[in-house]
């Protein structure tokens, strides 16, 4: 009899009989594509989620080890948290390509849940396992700090800044895709799921100047 692994994802009980990386279950079964697959080996942090309140990389946690745990992704943030992070990251310019941002947000949430008013050094430590190739981290650090201030009630949200009511030369403005990228709704190629979708992988010869005489496709069928 196969074993069943049960856990709670964003408040919803889930279970599976298949032991595999939690990342694959969240993306392929639940379609929670805010959990990005940047490396599949725990190096980049784009798949950062909360597991029992702690920041964890979903690609290195199996469904078996996740059994009995409470899991939260960006989709499971409260309305107040979503609005705080969207505004903060947009206001400081923390979003560029956006691929790393949901993981940064979850690392930031894990910190703010434990320490609502962190120092810059504490924010840097909290995101040390998250890689960003665009921003140089400064804006992301500022974004987490501002999100914390908003959630503490020490900073306010200016809706006009996001809505762009007074755009003009030299005016501050959000990127138009900030909300989707912060909340993990921006679609990248790997986020597309189609019925009957096939996958391909490049296979290269181990030998230089080798001539391919035959291909056995049985493993792929």
Name what the model sees in each region.
Residues 1-162, 179:
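Signature of N-terminal electron-transfer/Fe-S-associated modules in redox systems
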